[in-house]
Amino acid sequence: ANYFDVEAVSNSIKPGAYARLPYTSKVLAENLVRRATEDQKSIGLKQILNSENSQDFPWYPARVVCHDILGQTALVDLAGLREAIAAQGGNPSNVNPVVPTQLIVDLSLAVEHGGHEPDARLKNQEIEQRRNDDRFHFIEWTKKAFQNVDVVPPGNGIMHQINLERMSPVIHKVNGIAYPDTCLLY
């Protein structure tokens, strides 16, 4: 795979500075070199290399990980936008998240049956399904309707555990270019 030589670009601005950067700053610098306009790149890299924070610069996450409640709200907005575009004669299937979005359905299980009861977990999951049927139906629809949306169903763990243990690729490779994983937890 190919990659952007962030060290060379950084050292052309401030020789030797890249080697002294913390890892997180190197990831931000790579993101700027790969994605930003020349002006944004220049402003952002100078700030990173000089440990300054006088101006904002763009950051483009490789993916977004959403808790189901917050992510569902965003997907409802996208569904509404699709309806409006269709009403105007446009193609609603053109409305999709720009970056891969992972919706994790977690933390909605209410405990009605205790661990001493046979099949307590199964009974609690059945109650959860019944109480949240409309919500789960919408979430399942979004998985099929939108490109760039992946859904992790309930019962698989909490958001941070799932992200760290199962979802983070550490390095992405798209169109022959390798770059570090960056994630916005929403």
Which residues does each predicted region cover?
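Fe-S-dependent hydro-lyases/dehydratases of central metabolism
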Residues: A1-Y186
